[in-house]
Amino acid sequence: MFNLLKPFYPLVLTAAKSNPEGAHLQLLNTLNTLERTHHTRGGNWLLSQLDQSFCVDDSRLKQTLWGLTFNNPVGLAAGCDKEGIAAGIWSHLGFGFAELGAVTLHPQPGNPRPRLFRLPHDKAVLNRLGANNQGAEIMAQTLAEIWQRSPRNIPIGINLCKSKITPLDEAAQDYVGSFSYLENQADYFVVNVSSPNTPGLRSLQEGEQLNSILQALQAANQHQKPLFVKISPDLEEEAILTIIELAQTHCLAGIIATNTTIKRDRLTTQILPETGNKIQEEAGGISGLPIRDRSTEIIGFIYQKTQGKLPIIGVGGIFTPDDAWNKIIAGASLLQLYTGWIYQGPWIIPDIVRGLGDKLKQLGLSHISQAVGINHK
């Protein structure tokens, strides 16, 4: 059913261009309504149609990592479902896992609008949302209600960010506060110290500050939930090595590479039409195709420096099966995407999943784990 709509998706993108944030919120609310009504005859039928259109079953892509089962390696990146209101639906759209948030301990409205811009010539998005969300306590309530109605049938992660009002020297307590509310509502957690849209946040990637955050979180992590750190694509090698060392010291599950970039050097867009300003003057992080190669480069660097012993979730600029494959052979065990999903619609997930299966067949590999880091073997 939904495959019949694919030719019309560019029209949807065009219609939503004037208000991308509003269109996205409308989509999330629609998915939330579907989740709430899934037990009805009509809702159950719609979910079955989603499953038929977007879910691909391939045992060669199934992995168990950190005690969690991933039916395929393609996950939803943080930033899409900030409040977790569609948490019960992402599995029906073909994702192997989903990361919710970013969420902060304290509710915050984010930055002034407009704050989300599509750069179609670059297949990119400029976002300066500012971690707008209702706070960790409300998200915990939302997810508890969803899990009562819908099974948690894919691994769910939550991206934790520091509240804007919290001083940098109190960041550790802020992250722990969010974790305490949400610990029972997700399968893994991510320490976001790399968003460019919270003042000073990126400084928390530095050794001493990140050390205190990870130490506090692991002390609070009584159930040993897998804990990751998400890093910036703008880091130099020395800074990445420091984070690798801390990740190993604090027994992190892995590293997510990477978040958005503040660099503008790979953009063809020079003027932001919505404001008339030069793109270099516009605050915010760039996601999508412009960070594809840099994120893949960092994945390879981490894999080589850790000899493949620290798992990597690769994210940034995935639009095609080749993009996904290149991150896997560079060293990523799992993948995430969001911007590609916006530009190409939900069909991108089954396309990539099938494409990964085709790659395995071409190389005579029997399982996706055999391809991880194969560039360095």
UniProtKB/Swiss-Prot annotation:
Could you list this entry's UniProt keywords, alphabetically sorted: Cell membrane, Flavoprotein, FMN, Membrane, Oxidoreductase, Pyrimidine biosynthesis
Q: Which residues are listed for substrate binding in this entry?
A: K82, N127, R128, L129, G130, N192, N197, N259, T260
Tell me where it mainly resides: membrane
Any idea which positions bind FMN? A78, G79, C80, D81, K82, A102, N159, N192, K230, T258, G288, G317, Y338, T339
Which cofactors go with this protein? FMN
Q: From the record, what ranges are coiled-coil?
A: none
What does this protein's record comment on cofactor binding?
A: Binds 1 FMN per subunit.
What topology in the membrane does the UniProt record assign? Peripheral membrane protein
| BP terms from Gene Ontology | 'de novo' pyrimidine nucleobase biosynthetic process; 'de novo' UMP biosynthetic process
Q: What is its EC number?
A: 1.3.5.2
GO-annotated molecular function: dihydroorotate dehydrogenase (quinone) activity
One cellular-component annotation, GO: cytoplasm
Catalytic residues identified in the record: S195 (nucleophile)
Any idea where this protein resides? Cell membrane
Q: Which Pfam families match?
A: DHO_dh (PF01180)
Q: What is catalysed by this protein?
A: (S)-dihydroorotate + a quinone = orotate + a quinol
Copy the pathway line from the protein's UniProt record. Answer: Pyrimidine metabolism; UMP biosynthesis via de novo pathway; orotate from (S)-dihydroorotate (quinone route): step 1/1
Family per record: Belongs to the dihydroorotate dehydrogenase family. Type 2 subfamily.
Q: What interactions and quaternary structure are annotated?
A: Monomer.
The record's section on PANTHER family has: DIHYDROOROTATE DEHYDROGENASE (QUINONE), MITOCHONDRIAL, DIHYDROOROTATE DEHYDROGENASE (QUINONE), MITOCHONDRIAL-RELATED
Q: Which NCBIfam families did the record assign? A: PRK05286.2-4, PRK05286.2-5, pyrD_sub2
Q: What does this protein do?
A: Catalyzes the conversion of dihydroorotate to orotate with quinone as electron acceptor.
Q: Please give the HAMAP family that the UniProt record associates with this protein.
A: DHO_dh_type2
In Swiss-Prot or TrEMBL terms, this protein is called: Dihydroorotate dehydrogenase (quinone)
Q: Which organism is it from?
A: Rippkaea orientalis (strain PCC 8801 / RF-1)
The gene coding this protein: pyrD
